[in-house]
C-alpha cells in the first residue's frame, strides 16, 4: 500500500518535475491549480510505480467521502494505481481519451463530462471571430485596469 499525503507547498518541486518529464494532456493539471483548489476539494498525492497520482476526497473533513483519482502522471496505469493505493476509489476524473478507451475495454463504465473537457480552437478562428459561433467572444470588451 502506498503512502497518501495531503498536497502541500513542499510538494511543488516534485510535482513540477513529474509534469516536466510527463507533460499532461489535461490543461488544468498544474501544481498551482491543484494547490489553489486544495481547500475546496481536499487533494492528496501518492508516488506509485515512478508516477505521481492525485486523489481528491469529495467529503468534508471527518466525513469519509468518496476518493476520486486523477490520471497518473508517469507510466503507471490507472488500474495498477487503484490496486496499489489500497483504498476504495469511487472513480477517475479528467482522463485522456486513450485511457478512457483502455478503461472501456476493461468493461468499466466511462462517461464524458463535456463541462470539464478541454477545447481546442484554430488560431485563425480566434483571430477573426467570424460568424455566430463566436458572437459572445466578439462582444467581450477588454477593460484595462490599474493596480
Report each predicted region and the residues it spans.
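Short amphipathic alpha-helix that is part of the acyltransferase structural core
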Residues: 1-27, 126-147
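Conserved donor-binding loop and adjoining core beta-sheet/short helix segment
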Residues: 17, 28-98
